[in-house]
Amino acid sequence: NNCYSPNPGINDWYETVKINYGDSHTGTWDKMLDILLYWAGKGVDGFRCDMVELVPPEFMKWLIAEVKKNYPDVIFIAEVYKKELYGEYVREVGFDFLYDKSGLYDTLRTVVEKNVDDNGMPVELWQSATGITRNWQFLSDLQPYMLNFLENHDERRFASDFFGKDASRTFAPLFVSLYLNTAPF
């Protein structure tokens, strides 16, 4: 989140190194490529790019193309939080898949965890279905590129005591995430 404060807050990523990618192709680009080519050469078949919105898209487009010249089957997965950028990261930057955190995950989380709307009113089944449907319609032709999930290193597990309270409450979100779209995972 580009925090450079001497007094960072609890949600600031002060411990994350800020890499200077420059305005155009730099030595940093070449070093990053060397790292990915090294690991691809060792048999790594995919790379998950965390918070890719904080990395210049020009760099990511170049990097993906360069890696795929030597390892065309390597998969690139992006964590993108702004849904309005999903299409750009697939069609223009070249990512193979995106995590649908801001869409389906957040919708299912609201249904499971709160079961209330922003005003504290109970969410009826039709309201939950409407949110899921809206997300599905928003994705449209991007659905095959979306990876659905119920947990990751940044989020609480759906089946945890801090989240759904009861593992059986995760069955419906699991089925929705598995069968809602045509993603391969």
Residue ranges and their predicted role:
Residues 1-38, 63, 69, 86-87:
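Substrate-binding/active-site clefts of carbohydrate-active enzymes
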Residues 22, 79, 102, 150-152, ...:
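Structured loops at beta-to-helix junctions and adjacent beta-edge loops in soluble globular domains
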Residues 13-29, 44-54, 111-124, 155-165:
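The substrate-binding groove and active-site-proximal loops of carbohydrate-active enzymes
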Residues 34-37, 45, 50-142, 146, ...:
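Active-site-proximal helices and loops of the catalytic beta/alpha 8
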Residues 36, 133-185:
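Active-site-proximal substrate-binding groove within the catalytic cores of carbohydrate-active enzymes
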Residues 1, 60, 165-167:
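Aromatic- and glycine-enriched glycan-recognition loops and surfaces
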